[in-house]
């Protein structure tokens, strides 16, 4: 059950000039819905992308990395669900290359101008023949169709749009989709996300922007602490807006566009947590007054990853010693527990090394009963801060993953 997350309809999502969408039923795992998505770019565009840090990364990740900087630019993106094409060795790479070749033939570009993406079950060979057979049958689609077609264990399609000023006289549009529900962990996870904007941005600048946005959004979420083999985040700048190219990070428009796309990416990232497998609560962990942002993140992740903390939230049980224990084992060697403060929403829970004198069990129970909760931790060591988003851990998480291949 997703936490305060609903599907967006096609009329709520902005069309982006310079990109065409198509979907088809390839029948890779399921036969009752579209599982193949094609994005065709009209040319003159640039693409930035970041990929999983998992050393056992999937075959399409290897191929997409090698194609990203093709001298003639990316012209097509092909995405299949139902099979990750990971743990498939040399044959997996051959299958990913064949997918690119078939897509190139269908779209009129070079195979090296195609980026392939896969998501689904690991250690099973990809039915590349089904993809090749489905490509000529692709039907025009909208962003809502594409959001549904890239789903795996997701219960709600994830999409969003933004429109805002970049520069003095130009309005920029952006629309994005994402998938992900389990195996979600910082440094990218079992998630795919694609954002398209009509802004014009040079490739090196867009690549840097993509990396920075990923670090500030998708790298701040965790559902279960597992890092996937396939995760990827892509930004497409079609350049169809009439503004001049952003080719320098010193250009004031760089920050304006980054803020616009970052807001969109954060909504998509949070949607993944809201739809975390079996999730019933959306939890924000905010760590303040740390020496560095990395230190703040280290503490936030310790709390957000803890199964004991997450099950306490699921039970609406203010067993808050679990949170303090997680802070304590976060690995901050010189942390002074006697000066930190911890809050549940606005309720002071702990200070001076123990339970706050003003805190009552009834206050904690009232906050824990909510479906959206903020944990705020003040370390009183410096000025840095970081925020991480997570969800609770329920019986359904176990059931969903136990039944995943059945």
Range-by-range predicted roles:
Residues 100:
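Generic structural marker for isolated residues within well-ordered, non-membrane alpha-helices
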